[in-house]
Amino acid sequence: RGPLSGDCLDLVVERHHSQGWYLLRGNHEEFVLDCGGPDQPLSGPVFEMKRFAHFALAQVVDHVDLLRRLPDEFEQEGPNGQLLRIVHASMRSNRDGIYPMTPEEEIRRQIAPAPAVFVTGHTHRPLMRQVDDTLVVNIGSVGSPFDKDRRAGYGQFTWHRDHWQAEIVR
């Protein structure tokens, strides 16, 4: 989403191939893919609500098949079996965000089955929160942070001795 969607996608695809970056589908990718459907209006109020996605689609039209194939989640198991799971929003939906004020009972449902580390990003607001035995991390956003800090935000996750270590980088 933004003026250089095609360039951004090219960069992360190149990093996927050269450095092993993992790519996931989020709600914006779904918006863009929906705009390419045969029943989408090209004018009127519905089009105007989705104009941003039509603009992005025009920039990434050569990568539509790649966007369709993106997985909804990624999991990495540590040497001792601790699971790191990454999704766009929650296990229920890529539009079901975890916020600082979300009650723990709700988070338990959003991350089930609970891994050692659950990584999300949909809300564009950085967050690290322990819920039972799970570290819940919202990595924020590189291009559109919603926490009044305009610096790019992303997460780094490394295996350290016997556990996952999480860091939000700004």
Segments from the language model and where they lie:
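Active-site environment of divalent metal-dependent phosphoester hydrolases
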Residues: 1-3, 28-33, 94, 117-130, ...
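N-terminal active-site segment of His-dependent metallophosphoesterases
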Residues: 1-18
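Divalent metal-coordination and catalytic microenvironments
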Residues: 12, 26, 67, 88, ...
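Active-site neighborhood of divalent metal-dependent phosphoester bond hydrolases
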Residues: 14-76, 80-83, 100-114
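Beta-strand-turn-beta hairpins that frame and shape the catalytic cleft
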Residues: 75-85, 131-135, 164
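A short secondary-structure junction signal
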Residues: 87-89, 95-100, 129-132, 148-151
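Anionic-ligand binding region
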Residues: 101-129, 134-142
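Acidic, His/Gly-rich catalytic cores of divalent-metal-dependent hydrolytic chemistry
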Residues: 129-170
